């Protein structure tokens, strides 16, 4: 890699980014290791916050430090307005137009086939996250959970004869959205944030004895129940000696982690990992 790479995951609320230095060594792929973070710098901003993209541009400018123009790989689910704002921030950061790949969902990537009825209608973040997970865990059935504004559960299966398939999945309101909806649409229920809900999960009480904790426990149980039910269904149809691997990512992953009763592994951002895999395949 003769030039750095900038990976950008534009979600509904936050923009997450990672910077891969030119010439940085890649982690080895064993198919059994924990998922890597093959970048040297990373960060996140609330993209609608005043001045957030200007601050990001300044940080990226400092990382480039007059060196080669980076190639940029972007996954965007926030729509065209934020896309234009990010384009402007990149021009501000680099003093010109860096080569940008706006990733779209496709029928396949490598040996991973997109099993969606209309492959291009699959949310690009879900597709890219699955690509990233499968790139590093190519022999495993995967339940990819991304806990963001929405919580998505995506399934990747591996055929005995080779090849893999994105089977589809589930979408449910994210933890913050569940908590906020209760507060906004009821007269007397209090507002909770994700951190407060996570502390209730950590308390390990079976039943809540107050309204605050009952809301947190109920929303966490809904999220965890969907994950656990899907994980068990995958296990029932697969190889008992090689259970599915549940991968937990997204901003609310820490809160959900305390509520789950199935084995899981956490990664900071599977979408960035997928963008990295796509960029390397294109090199």
Curated annotation (Swiss-Prot):
EC number(s) on file: 2.7.1.33
Active site positions, chain numbering: 125 (proton acceptor)
Main EC class the enzyme belongs to: transferase
Cofactor binding notes: A monovalent cation. Ammonium or potassium.
Pathway participation: Cofactor biosynthesis; coenzyme A biosynthesis; CoA from (R)-pantothenate: step 1/5
CDD domains reported for this sequence: ASKHA_NBD_PanK-III
GO cellular-component term (any): cytoplasm
Ligand binding (ATP): 9-16, 149
Pfam family, one: Pan_kinase
Catalytic activity: (R)-pantothenate + ATP = (R)-4'-phosphopantothenate + ADP + H(+)
Family: Belongs to the type III pantothenate kinase family.
Subunit structure, interactors included: Homodimer.
Name by which UniProt lists this protein: Type III pantothenate kinase
Organism: Cupriavidus taiwanensis (strain DSM 17343 / BCRC 17206 / CCUG 44338 / CIP 107171 / LMG 19424 / R1) (Ralstonia taiwanensis (strain LMG 19424))
